[in-house]
């Protein structure tokens, strides 16, 4: 995830926590606040109960990657903090983790509802009309 899309300073995290709304799932807590910029920025926090440094870093990397894949579809103008609550994030199937994050983002109205168009597996762009039936 590029640096422009990340929260980095403690005061940025503090502002999101103080001004934002919170959405929870069994694995994650998402806190969302309107940004002072037009971009979308994300921060990732891992609870110590997840495990040692290696486990916490692995959990952070997995969640960061799942969010990175969704970035082009997210509504800009918000700062988000994902707090990883449990060690299950480390061993969970990646698709299940993505589904959990997608549900949280939809709950926060940052991810539009899916359309019925066929989507290319390589990118999120719809396939051209002539390729739809030949899959």
From Swiss-Prot:
The keyword Transferase does not apply. Consists of a catalytic RNA component (M1 or rnpB) and a protein subunit. Signal peptide: none annotated. The keyword Endoplasmic reticulum does not apply. Belongs to the RnpA family. InterPro entries: Ribosomal_Su5_D2-typ_SF, Ribsml_uS5_D2-typ_fold_subgr, RNase_P, RNase_P_CS. One of its GO terms (cellular component) is ribonuclease P complex. It holds the Pfam family Ribonuclease_P. Keywords: Endonuclease, Hydrolase, Nuclease, RNA-binding, tRNA processing. Coiled coil: none annotated. Its EC number is 3.1.26.5. This is Ribonuclease P protein component. One of its GO terms (molecular function) is 3'-tRNA processing endoribonuclease activity. It catalyses: Endonucleolytic cleavage of RNA, removing 5'-extranucleotides from tRNA precursor. One of its GO terms (biological process) is tRNA 3'-end processing. The gene is rnpA. RNaseP catalyzes the removal of the 5'-leader sequence from pre-tRNA to produce the mature 5'-terminus. It can also cleave other RNA substrates such as 4.5S RNA. The protein component plays an auxiliary but essential role in vivo by binding to the 5'-leader sequence and broadening the substrate specificity of the ribozyme. Residues 115-135 are annotated as: Disordered.
């Amino acid at each position: 995830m590029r640096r422009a899309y990340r929260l980095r300073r403690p005061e940025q995290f503090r502002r999101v926590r103080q001004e934002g709304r919170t959405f929870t799932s069994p694995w994650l807590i998402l806190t969302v606040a309107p940004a002072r910029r037009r971009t979308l920025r994300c921060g990732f926090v891992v609870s110590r109960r997840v495990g040692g440094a290696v486990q916490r870093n692995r959990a952070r990397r997995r969640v960061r990657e799942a969010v990175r894949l969704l970035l082009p579809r997210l509504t800009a103008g918000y700062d988000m903090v994902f707090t990883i609550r449990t060690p299950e994030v480390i061993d969970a199937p990646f698709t299940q983790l993505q589904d959990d994050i997608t549900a949280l983002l939809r709950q926060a109205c940052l991810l539009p509802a899916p359309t019925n168009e066929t989507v290319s597996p390589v990118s999120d762009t719809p396939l051209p009309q002539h390729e739809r039936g030949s899959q």
